[in-house]
């Protein structure tokens, strides 16, 4: 199957955005496409069942972008994990903040650069990063992400990553669409010395906002 795309128009942070994403989640690059641009770019090391997930603009990612569009991060170094289409990173970059977008699928980095160009902003730096083999040159002031608790093991992996990558004075912000592993994540965070505040932005819906910081 040849990879197909579509453009999505939306308003976030007081401006309109044109975002290129996969036309559907039932896609994977052909061998010809991999060879034409290089397997590293296409994320050939990612399983077919997971590969398209990094190319879709999910509701939790839109909510994360809306949140960071209204918050201040002057002088802070920000990392978005599991960025996918990385709308939040694009919004932060458009506001002049120091942000790095990261994902285990290098294809996300290609979309990031294309969407930055579509919206006439500098492309945020992209870092290929996974929970299992994280690379952190120095800790971050702020770590953000959306729908990062998609598997049972993610609760421990994300917590361990925060211990490694978040400054003692730093904070994390995650948007979760209602995954069953949030309670385990909260317990794991508390055991590791973190505090976690959970907010339901819309009454009656499952989506949650998690704000995390280290105990003093």
Language-model features: locations:
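S-adenosylmethionine-dependent methyltransferases
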Residues: 1-216
